[in-house]
Amino acid sequence: MAVDVPTSVIVKLMFFTLAMVSFPVLTFFVSQQYTSNTLVNGGLAALAANVVLFAYVIMAFSEDVPQSDGKESKKQQ
């Protein structure tokens, strides 16, 4: 039972997966250049992960939902 998933959904998922892995790690190591406190570096990396997560949630809620024909809504009533 294969489901046709739009390519735009796959592209968004791959982008945010890559961002969720690379952005916090990059933030951690870049912030190490400015401070040697690993607690601050870890906190900034966690903040970067939350930024990516919130961006994904906002994009998911703003995504267009395909309109169905009226047949399903009549069945539910």
Curated annotation (Swiss-Prot):
Residues 1-8, 63-77 are cytoplasmic. This is Vacuolar ATPase assembly integral membrane protein VMA21. GO terms for cellular component: endoplasmic reticulum membrane; endoplasmic reticulum-Golgi intermediate compartment membrane; ER to Golgi transport vesicle membrane. The gene is VMA21. It comes from the Eukaryota. It is found in: Endoplasmic reticulum membrane; Endoplasmic reticulum-Golgi intermediate compartment membrane; Cytoplasmic vesicle, COPII-coated vesicle membrane. InterPro entries: Vma21. Residues 30-41 are lumenal.
